[in-house]
Every structure is written in C-alpha cells, then in structure tokens.
C-alpha cells in the first residue's frame, strides 16, 4: 500500500520540510523572545550586550526543540496516513496527541497523558480554525461562479469584485449589450469563414481554369483530327486484271 496523494509533500520530504520549518520558526521566535528577556534582565548600560548573549545561548536550543517536535509530528502524521489510507484532520489530531505523549514519557504516565490531551486539543483547534478559514474564503468564489448573467461578458468578472457593482446584472441595457457583442462576434466569424472559402475557391478556380483551358484547347484539335480522317477517302484498290 502506498501513501495517497495529498496537497502536501510526500512523507519523506514532508518530514524534512516540517523539521526545517519548525527549526526556523523556533529560531526566529526564540531569538525575539530571548533578546527581549535578556535586555530586560540585564543591568543598565549593557542591555544590548545581554540581549545578544541571551539570544546566542538560548535561540539554537529553542529551534532544536521545535525541530524535534515537528519531526515527530510529521512522522506520526505519515504513519496515520499510511495506516488509514486517507488524508483528513483526524491524522493531525492523533499525531499531535502522540507527539505530546511521546515527548513526556520520561516524566511518567500522568504527565504523558496530560501532554497527549493538550497536544490533541491544540491540533484540533488549529485544524478547526483552518477549516473555518477555508469555508469563509470559499464563499465569495462560489457566489461569483453561481452568477450566470455576468460570466459571459468580457471584463464583468473583474467588475463583480468591485463595491457597488452587484446590481449591474439587473440593468436593462446589460442584456442588449451582451446580445450585440454576441452578434458582432458571430458576424466576424462568418466573414472570416467566407474569406477563407473565397480564397480557397479562387485558388481552386484558378488551377481549374488552367486545366479547363488545356482541355478546351485539346478537345477542338482532337475533333478536327477526327473530322479530317472521316472526310478523307481511301484510294481505290488496284486490280491486275487485263482489259
């Protein structure tokens, strides 16, 4: 059984991609957090130096922790995709719970179970927010696609997104403009077809005229030859009888 096709990267590449992305997020976010913390905790006159030292000491560790979490999450996610043979939010929720529980196993069963519940709830909230955001973004597109009167006219699709333009469909002149444009397009197409047929007929008539002339020139000659042969009388057969 193979991994089903999804919009994300395949599982080996997905794991590496998530590890790199999580490390980048942890490094950038950790740098900002530890710089502010080091600046606040440093004495006056050396706050900037204290902030940079705090970043250099703690930001790589934070990025590594994020990378470990992202790698384990992607591994569990790919495992669920392989076992269930489908891609849905439940894979991410189960992977988040498994990751939280796995990272807290050294602290005991109670801490591992609490971390698993926290990871599952966190991933459920993230997946729910993503689904709601996709629905909200998909509604305007569906409304534009379901509008049958404005799709046929060129440039109306861009005008639908402008404020104050939803009432353009009900105007009495819009249908007449659309019919006029359709008729003009049909006339242009018919004229182009007529020009093509006229050019092809003229070329064929030109070649046909040449061949017809040759035929006409050949046919009178052949008729004259036959007429001359028919009018010519054969000579009498000589006889050798003595008279």
From Swiss-Prot:
Chain spans, region Disordered: 166-243
Any Pfam family the entry gives: Tim17
Biased composition (Basic and acidic residues): 211-228
Sequence repeat residue numbers: 149-151, 152-154, 155-157, 158-160, 161-163, 164-166, 167-169, 170-172, 173-175, 176-178
Phenotype of null mutants: Lethal when homozygous.
Bias kind Polar residues: ranges: 184-198
Transmembrane segments: 19-36, 66-83, 90-109, 115-137
Upregulation: Up-regulated after antimycin A or rotenone treatments.
GO CC annotation terms, alphabetical: endoplasmic reticulum; mitochondrial inner membrane; mitochondrial outer membrane; mitochondrion; TIM23 mitochondrial import inner membrane translocase complex
Region spans: 10 X approximate repeats GMQ/P: 149-178
Ranges of compositional bias, category Low complexity: 166-183
Subcellular localization: Mitochondrion inner membrane; Mitochondrion outer membrane
Top-rank taxon, per record: Eukaryota
Keywords, sorted A to Z: Membrane, Mitochondrion, Mitochondrion inner membrane, Mitochondrion outer membrane, Protein transport, Repeat, Translocation, Transmembrane, Transmembrane helix, Transport
Tissue expression notes: Expressed in roots, flowers, leaves and young cotyledons.
GO biological process, one term: protein insertion into mitochondrial inner membrane
Domain notes: An internal targeting signal (103-117) is required for insertion into the mitochondrial inner membrane in a membrane potential-dependent manner. The C-terminal region is exposed on the outer surface of the outer membrane and is essential for protein import.
Subunit structure: Component of the TIM17:23 complex at least composed of TIM23, TIM17 and TIM50. The complex interacts with the TIM44 component of the PAM complex. Interacts with TIM23-2.
Family affiliation: Belongs to the Tim17/Tim22/Tim23 family.
Name of this chain's protein: Mitochondrial import inner membrane translocase subunit TIM17-2
Organism: Arabidopsis thaliana
């Amino acid at each position: 059984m193979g991994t089903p096709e999804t919009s994300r990267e395949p599982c080996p590449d997905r794991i590496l991609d998530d590890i790199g992305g999580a490390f980048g997020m942890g490094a950038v976010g950790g740098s900002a957090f530890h710089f502010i913390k080091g600046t606040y905790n440093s004495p006056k006159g050396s706050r900037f130096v204290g902030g940079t030292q705090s970043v250099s000491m703690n930001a790589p560790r934070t990025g590594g922790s994020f990378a470990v979490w992202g790698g384990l999450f992607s591994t569990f996610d790919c495992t669920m995709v392989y076992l269930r043979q489908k891609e849905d939010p439940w894979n991410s929720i189960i992977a988040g719970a498994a990751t939280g529980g796995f990272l807290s196993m050294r602290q005991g069963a109670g801490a591992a179970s609490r971390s698993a519940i926290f990871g599952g709830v966190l991933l459920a909230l993230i997946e729910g927010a993503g689904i709601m955001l996709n629905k909200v973004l998909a509604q305007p597109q569906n409304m534009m696609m379901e509008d049958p009167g404005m799709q046929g006219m060129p440039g109306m699709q861009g005008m639908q997104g402008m404020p104050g333009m939803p009432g353009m469909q009900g105007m009495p002149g819009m249908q007449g403009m659309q019919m006029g444009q359709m008729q003009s397009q049909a006339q242009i197409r018919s004229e182009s077809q007529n020009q093509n047929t006229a050019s092809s007929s003229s070329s064929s008539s030109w070649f046909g005229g040449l061949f017809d002339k040759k035929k006409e020139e050949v046919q009178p000659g052949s008729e004259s030859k036959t007429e001359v042969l028919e009018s010519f009388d054969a000579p009498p057969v000589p006889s050798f009888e003595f008279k």
